[in-house]
Swiss-Prot record:
Binding, (2E)-4-hydroxy-3-methylbut-2-enyl diphosphate: H49, H85, H135, T176, S234, S235, N236, S279
Catalytic function, reaction form: isopentenyl diphosphate + 2 oxidized [2Fe-2S]-[ferredoxin] + H2O = (2E)-4-hydroxy-3-methylbut-2-enyl diphosphate + 2 reduced [2Fe-2S]-[ferredoxin] + 2 H(+); dimethylallyl diphosphate + 2 oxidized [2Fe-2S]-[ferredoxin] + H2O = (2E)-4-hydroxy-3-methylbut-2-enyl diphosphate + 2 reduced [2Fe-2S]-[ferredoxin] + 2 H(+)
Residues that coordinate or bind isopentenyl diphosphate: H49, H85, H135, S234, S235, N236, S279
Name of the featured protein: 4-hydroxy-3-methylbut-2-enyl diphosphate reductase
Keyword Membrane: no
Superkingdom of this protein's organism: Bacteria
A Pfam family per the record: LYTB
InterPro entries noted in UniProt: LytB/IspH
Free-text comment on the cofactor: Binds 1 [4Fe-4S] cluster per subunit.
Length: 333
């Protein structure tokens, strides 16, 4: 009996991909808090936008809440962790008023944007925030300043329609996970309309967002399908889908697990692009590769632009706790 040969497939695996330093740090903070203080450790909002990560932490004893008033009175001696996206100033103030011990897992690069926005405000500038309405990072950044101090711009059309109170006294910052190209277009339009618009001291879009978009741009041309591993509420993952399509992939999709793959829809392909958003764990990337290997004679080739070496320290209270490979195996494999 002849067994049909598997069709050949080239998988262009992008590097860098997956966890950035800020996401890695945030997950480590929850894991170390559980080791240090025991379960439950409460986390306000999803620590990162990935259900696999959230469920893995829940299995270890983390409890996710949307607001601090959801924490039972009998557990108020337990720590609460703020997510990597950052929070408005009112949240730590609320924690203090409730006598809660909190650990802030805000990405240091998001904290930098907060400081840039506050500096604009301190110098008397109205802050223009380029970002997506409703995203936790945008809510957190806007919440650093008094109400009315920030105007949100999402698109070039918004930039065209924006009418400031004082056009000569504006400063901008951006969400860290935006499309690099789209954001450049919005900034250019704002600068065209408001020549005195003050830029932040450093680019607000983070290194990981930029790096992941650049390698997807390089790998996408000629791909029959480009898969981005990530959650539907992950801003940076959704931007990667858009980047792949613009760069020449015939089709690009966002998936969270291999079980979501629709093989009838995928059909006959010969070249697959594969990357992962900054909150997607490597174990899922491997899961996707193995799913394709089960159906194709797959050859993986690495498409790499840069190697990332960034590393952010966890909170001082947790630095004496040992973090082992076993502690992080649920996301790293």
């Amino acid at each position: 009996m002849n067994i049909a040969a598997k069709p050949p497939l080239t998988i262009r695996l992008c590097g860098p991909r997956g966890f950035c330093a800020g996401v890695d740090r945030a997950i480590q903070i929850v894991v170390l808090a559980l080791k240090s203080y025991g379960a439950p450790v409460y986390v306000r909002h999803e620590i990162v936008h990935n259900r696999y990560v959230v469920e893995g932490l829940e299995a270890k004893g983390a409890v996710f809440v949307e607001e601090l008033d959801e924490i039972p009175a009998e557990h108020r001696a337990q720590p609460v962790v703020f997510s990597a996206h950052g929070v408005p100033k009112s949240v730590p103030e609320d924690a203090v008023s409730r006598n809660l011990f909190y650990l802030d897992a805000t990405c240091p690069l998001v904290s930098k944007v907060h400081k840039q926005a506050m500096r604009h405000n301190r110098l008397g500038r109205h802050v223009v925030l380029i970002g997506h309405a409703g995203h936790p990072e945008v809510i957190g950044t806007m919440g650093q300043l008094p109400e009315g101090s920030v105007s949100l711009i999402e698109t070039i059309e918004d930039a065209d329609a924006y009418i400031p109170v004082d056009a000569d006294n504006l400063g901008y910052v951006t969400q860290t996970t935006l499309s690099v190209d789209d954001t450049a277009g919005v900034i250019a339009r704002l600068q065209e309309r408001f020549p005195n618009l003050t830029a932040p001291a450093a680019d607000s879009i983070c290194y990981a967002t930029t790096n992941r978009q650049e390698v997807v741009k390089q790998a996408a041309p000629g791909c029959d399908l480009f898969i981005i591993v990530g959650a539907p509420n992950s801003s940076n993952s959704k931007r990667l889908v858009e980047v792949a399509l613009r760069a020449g992939a015939k089709k690009s999709i966002l998936v969270q697990r291999a079980a979501e793959l629709d093989w009838d829809e995928i059909g006959a392909i010969s070249t697959l692009g594969l990357s992962a958003g900054a909150s997607a764990p490597e174990v899922i990337v491997n899961e996707i590769i193995e799913a394709f290997r089960a159906r194709f004679d797959a050859r993986v080739e690495l498409a790499e632009t840069v190697q990332e070496t960034e590393n952010f320290l966890v909170n001082r209270e947790l630095r004496s706790i040992e973090l082992t490979a076993a502690d992080m195996a649920f996301v790293n494999g």
